[in-house]
Amino acid sequence: MGGGYDLNLFASPPDSNFVCSVCHGVLKRPARLPCSHIFCKKCILRWLARQKTCPCCRKEVKRKKVVHMNKLRKTIGRLEVKCKNADAGCIVTCPLAHRKGHQDSCPFELTACPNEGCTSQVPRGTLAEHRQHCQQGSQQRCPLGCGATLDPAERARHNCYRELHNAWSVRQERRRPLLLSLLRRVRWLDQATSVVRRELAELSNFLEEDTALLEGAPQEEAEAAPEGNVGAEVVGEPRANIPCK
């Protein structure tokens, strides 16, 4: 892609001295070599990146010797150019340096419709008319903040409470399957907890009974031991001598 301005952009053919020998367009940001030949800055820097000689006279050139031609740039900036929308009907001509300013206000410049959801691009001069008939432009959000997008007919019968209630109902219906699933899981966990609690109670009772049995056995043995000893002593005691009559 060339670095200069398209020749067809100008209202009248430019002087040949203003034409770049590399891209054959009108000089953009002109730069001069030590040999006095002038080129677009972009064109000559690309050239010197591949070759170290002037494109015209083939003399050796060093990149640091390239000089910017600011006065020539201003001269070219005063040349009259056509509007980029000339084919669409714009007949305005203006200095090259002012081309951007005209483009920002040109009634033939294509402009995107600002209405949300509309992808149309229309000439700036007809934008106001387009917005009056734009289907997307006729839709607006509820000014009370419920979030509904309404056209003129809907705005006349719109009820925020009803819209919010309907939205809430839809959300509840979407949540119902999840809530039912969670409820079934809670019930299952409650049943499982009851079973575990009952088994723990039975285990606790069993341990208490077992502990009581273990604690009662030594006491019974201790109480039985003295009775046995007394009996032994009685049996083993010698009999008293009974005098004979």
Curated annotation (Swiss-Prot):
Q: Does the keyword Zinc-finger apply?
A: yes
Entry GO MF terms: enzyme binding; identical protein binding; zinc ion binding
Q: In which tissues is it expressed?
A: Expression is testis-specific.
- Report TRAF-type zinc finger ranges: 101-156
| An example Gene Ontology CC term for this record | nucleus
Q: Which Pfam family, just one, is annotated for this protein?
A: zf-C3HC4_2
**Which sequence ranges does the entry mark as zinc finger (RING-type)?**
20-58
Enumerate the PROSITE patterns for this protein: ZF_RING_1, ZF_RING_2, ZF_SIAH, ZF_TRAF
Biological process terms in GO annotation: cell differentiation; spermatogenesis
Q: Which UniProt keywords apply?
A: Cytoplasm, Differentiation, Metal-binding, Nucleus, Spermatogenesis, Zinc, Zinc-finger
What ranges does the record give for the region Disordered, renumbered to this chain? 219-245
Database matches in InterPro entries: Znf_RING, Znf_RING/FYVE/PHD, Znf_RING_CS, Znf_SIAH, Znf_TRAF
Q: Where in the cell is it found?
A: Cytoplasm; Nucleus
Oligomer status and interactors? Interacts with DTNBP1.
Functionally, this protein is described as follows:
May be involved in acrosome formation of spermatids.
> What is the name of this protein?
RING finger protein 151
State the organism of origin.
Homo sapiens
